[in-house]
A protein has these predicted regions:
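A short, well-ordered alpha-helix in the C-terminal region of glycosyltransferases
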Residues: 316, 323, 330-345, 351-354
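Conserved acidic donor-binding segment of nucleotide-sugar-dependent glycosyltransferases
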Residues: 302-303, 307-314, 323-329
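Short hydrophobic beta-strand element within catalytic cores of glycosyltransferases
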Residues: 283, 287-290
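Nucleotide-activated donor-binding/catalytic signature segment of Leloir-type glycosyltransferases, i.e.
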Residues: 228-248
């Protein structure tokens, strides 16, 4: 029997972010490519992280070419299903609205897979409300977590929603490298909304209490610049406590995971949905401290695999870190529970199986 044809219109690296990494996992998946006759088109117009959300003539021209390419692909391959990873709000949504409308005009079955959020923040605007009604009509939607349904509840019935948590490849379980101090790791782009300053303030609190910590910030410089961050470390007299390493990948990143006692990610990023960095930390048996942003409460089990805290709460971050320092056995147990949860729910194999089943169901019920 001939495999059903699917056109995947998704984000691929560069730039590297959660949605593009998941796009790459789908693109490279033997399970998905062997199950379906897959065709791929890269939806990304941004060349790097700083380019995300910006306009310009180049992007306009590239988008026009994209629409033409989509139209030609639909006519030539005649897919049974189209899969799109759209943006939820703003100018990027208006662009993706046109993509989905083109697919609908061409009588395609469409499923959208959200890696961001923000519909609910714009649904009271007249234009956006009208466009959302048109956009979501007769659409199936994949969400990363039950927690994210509230974002689209106004427009989508729950029966048209699939829940599919992200997954990442299983890596070798790295041996722990014992350290004298309690080591904390932040692993993400160096953006204010990722909670960088909140963690730095927590480090300041712990330093004033005489706690022997080392906090490592690993990630690409973004709206927080290196000089700015170093100046802040110096101002707070944290040069022996806090270290900035820039972006690290592969084995270089693994070195930090090996030396870490607790992973802290106090994000309040407005597009945060299901951060892959938490899965990486859980895979390595690290207790995680993060916020109630997006789908994070469905990743971390509060007080079992780590802690869910309020956003903008450096004092609470400091308290949780101090507790883990003073209760090493509980710290280790949380890490073990996190790794078990990762292996049960968040591996790439589990993700691929979920996506395959969802797409098969969509084609059957179309």
């Amino acid at each position: 029997m001939t495999n059903k044809k699917i056109l995947f219109i998704l984000h691929l690296p560069p730039p590297v972010h959660g949605a593009s990494m998941v796009g790459k996992y789908i693109h490279d998946s033997e399970v998905i490519n062997n199950t379906f006759d897959c065709h791929y088109l890269n939806l990304a117009l941004a060349k790097d992280l700083n380019d995300i959300g910006k306009g310009g003539m180049r992007k306009l021209k590239d988008f026009y070419k994209q629409l033409k390419q989509i139209s030609l692909l639909i006519k030539s391959i005649k897919p049974q299903q189209c899969y799109v990873t759209p943006n939820a709000k703003g100018g990027a949504f208006y662009k993706d609205f046109l993509v989905v409308m083109l697919l609908k005009i061409m009588r395609q079955n469409v499923i959208v897979h959200y890696h961001n959020k923000g519909v609910a923040t714009r649904q009271n605007r007249c234009l956006d409300n009208l466009l959302y009604k048109m956009f979501f009509k007769n659409l199936k939607v994949i969400l990363l977590s039950e927690n994210l349904y509230q974002d689209i509840k106004k427009y989508v019935k729950y029966k048209d929603v699939y829940i599919c948590p992200n997954g990442i490849p299983i890596h070798e379980n790295l041996p722990t490298v014992p350290q004298k101090e309690f080591n904390i790791l932040f692993l993400s782009n160096m953006m204010e909304e990722k909670g960088v300053w909140d963690l730095l303030e927590a480090c300041t609190i712990l330093k004033k209490k005489g706690k022997p910590i080392k906090c490592h910030f690993v990630g690409k410089w973004s709206d927080i610049k290196e000089e700015q961050f170093i100046d802040e470390i110096n101002k707070r007299e944290l040069t022996e406590y806090v270290f900035a390493h820039g972006a690290k990948y592969g084995n270089e990143k693994d070195v930090f995971l090996q030396k870490t006692d607790a992973f802290v990610f106090p994000t309040y990023y407005n597009n945060e949905c299901f951060p892959l960095v938490l899965l990486e930390a859980m895979e390595q048996g690290l207790p995680c401290i993060s916020t109630n942003e997006g789908g994070i409460p469905s990743i971390i089990e509060n007080e079992k695999t780590g802690y869910i805290i309020e956003k903008h709460s450096p004092q609470i971050i400091a308290e949780k870190i101090e507790y883990l320092m003073e209760h090493p056995q509980q710290c280790a147990n949380m890490g073990k529970a996190g790794r078990k949860k990762f292996l049960n729910e968040f591996t790439l194999d589990k993700f691929e199986a979920r996506i395959k089943n969802i797409l098969e169901d969509c084609i059957i019920t179309a």
